Amino acid sequence: MNAANTGKLRRVTLFGAESTGKTTLANRLARHFVTVVAPEYGRTYTEIHGQDACSKQDMLKIAKGHLKLRREAETHAHRVLFEDTDPVITAVWSDILAGGRDKWFDRFRDYPDLYLLCDIDMPWVKDGVRYFGDPEERKKFHLACEAELKKRGVRYLKIGGDPEQRLAAAIAAVDALLAEPQK
């Protein structure tokens, strides 16, 4: 944790289906709160290894790669760290792409203070790495994401609307989180 921090570093994870503005929102939030983002590792892994790299072992490597990037980002964060996805969403990807998940995912409990579940009310953009352009597949993935958060009993907030509405809702949620007494 950065020496400028006092108290516990809060973590907020952007969560949801592809092409819902998670990366853009994470970066905008980091600028607003003058902190950093732990980048999405799954995209990097897919760009290097291709879209066929989707076995349970690939998903485990992606999850652990994300944790490494998060640890590095934590050393530069101030008060709050924004994560562009995390191992929990990788578990959902593993279920869908690999037909199941490594048991490591079910033991994973290192949750952020808040998940921001981005709605699918934004247009899907094909970029060569994304999988689910079909509206029904996208909806199915979104519902699987929310079900995973509910199953784990974690704190989350659904955000939707245009990019400015999402940013305003996210800023309000993070402000409220930062105002809470630390545990």
Region spans (language model):
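Glycine-rich phosphate-binding loop used to anchor ATP phosphates in small-molecule kinases
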Residues: L60-D110, V125
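The conserved Walker
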Residues: E18
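Phosphate-binding P-loop
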Residues: N2-L9
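A glycine- and Lys/Arg-enriched "phosphate-lid" helix/loop adjacent to the NTP-binding pocket
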Residues: A98-Q165, A169-I171, L178
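Conserved substrate/cofactor phosphate-moiety recognition/catalytic segment
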Residues: N27-R71
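Conserved lysine of the Walker
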Residues: K22
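Hydrophobic anchor at the beta1->P-loop junction of P-loop NTPases
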Residues: L14
